[in-house]
Each structure stands twice: as C-alpha cells, then as structure tokens.
Amino acid sequence: MLELIQHDSSYHLWAPSAQEKWYLITSLDDYSRYILYAQLLKKETSWAHIVALETMILTHGLPFSYYVDSHSIFRFVQGRDSFWRKHHTLTDESDPQWKQVLYDCNVKIIYALSPQAKGKIERPYQWLQDRIVRTCVRENVSDIRQAQTILNQEIRRYNFRQVHSTTQEVPYFRLQKALTEGTSLFREFKVRPPYQSVKDIFCLRLDRTVDSYRRVSFKSLVLKVNGVTQGDKVNIRIYPMNHLLSELRFWCNDRLVDVQRAKNRDLHLSIL
C-alpha cells in the first residue's frame, strides 16, 4: 500500500565545478519507490521543506504518514534545540513549523530511530549522487539551475523507465497500478474549516497577544490588526509570496480577521 513518504535532505557536492555543496530535498513513495519531489537548494530552511510538502500534497494528495529523521526542522528535542529555538527561529513554538503543517493536514509523522532505519532513503541518494555528479562533471556544470535541469532529467528517467532492483517494477507503473486497484492510502487534499486557503495551511505560524492599541509586534515590526480587541490571542499565518514579501493572515477565535503584507526582512524571515 502507498502509506509512507520518505522525506529527507542531502548536503553534497553535486556539481564539483561549482566548488560549493548544495542541499537536495526529496520525497519518495515507499511502496512504488516513485520520487515525488526533488529540489536542489543553496540553503536548507523550514520554508523549503514546507514548499516540498505543498508541492507533493497538492499534486498527489495526502499520504498516510511521513518518515523523517530527527533534524530540528522536523522534530524539537529539549536541550539540543533550546538555544536554537530561543534565538534563531521565527516563532517560539516547540513544535517545528514543518510538523505543524502536517498536523493541520492530519498526516502522521514517523521518526527514524536509528541510522539503519534510514537505509531506504539513503539508497536513492547514493544512486542520485553517482548519476548527477558524473553528468555535472561531464557537462562542466557550475550553476545550480543547470544542475536542477540534470536532476529533473534523471528523476524522469528513474520514475518512468528504470526497473527498480527491489520491486522489479518501474516506479511509475507500480504507482499507477496501486492507484487503479484502490490500494493507495493517498487521500484528496481539502482545506478544512475554519481555514479558507492553502495559504492558511502551507505556511509559517506565529502567535501573538493584541495590545491596548490593537497591535501585535515581533521584534521591531509593529502591526495594527483589524477586527480584534485588547488581549485577543492572534494566530498569524505567514505565507511567503517571493523572496521580498509575505502575506500575513490573522486568525482570531477561528475567524480570519485581517490580511496584510510585510517585507520578509522586517519579519527577519529568510526563505532563500
């Protein structure tokens, strides 16, 4: 059954001519071995992993569960992550942003408990490293966009043409057979009330209390909010629109009371 999505990132010198390592974020269906998402990035952030969730879920639907390691992006560990949480994150929630998205989607998270348990997802990385590095060397690739093009080509070849050594099937056809036979645990994604938009789900979150001037603040940024009174608890859903601007959706008592835009630099938000 299609019940588990293996999700991870790998930091590697994908294109030696670039003389810098990049992150590769992937999502892989455990049953069919079909690679659902693959993106090269210069920086690994919570938002990058949320974008991976959004892309995968809006394209393929909701899986039963995600399988990840204990990286701080996926799981808060008291002691290990306390300093990071207090000084370097957008919010002061102990539940990581990525985890909160899956909670809203009603998708279970399974954490790897040992290096051996991660063997499934590390095997595709070894294969990708071999293929992509060789191609990037042969074509003298030094730009991440060129490397992404090569990655996309390799993923298509793997998904649609390569017979997997374990399943003895091409991933795409194994995936389609399960969908046709109704043995898939993927569910259609729908925005659940009270939320109204995918921007309310695939986003960053921030909780604040309204002051006597009907404002909320974060560091140096002060925002006046419509539809609230002093003492109200506001949940701000932050949806980065691009590398400069984000949309802020203010929720209070399960109602969308205001929508504003703010500069990412004022939010101290880096998404690249």
Protein language model regions, located:
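Short, conserved catalytic/metal-binding motifs centered on acidic residues
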Residues: 8, 33, 66-69, 118, ...
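A structural microfeature
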Residues: 36-37, 258
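Acidic/histidine-rich, metal-coordinating catalytic segments
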Residues: 58-90, 113-115
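Charged alpha-helix within mobile-element recombinases
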Residues: 91, 97-190
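C-terminal, beta-rich DNA-binding module of retroviral/retroelements integrases
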Residues: 155, 159-272
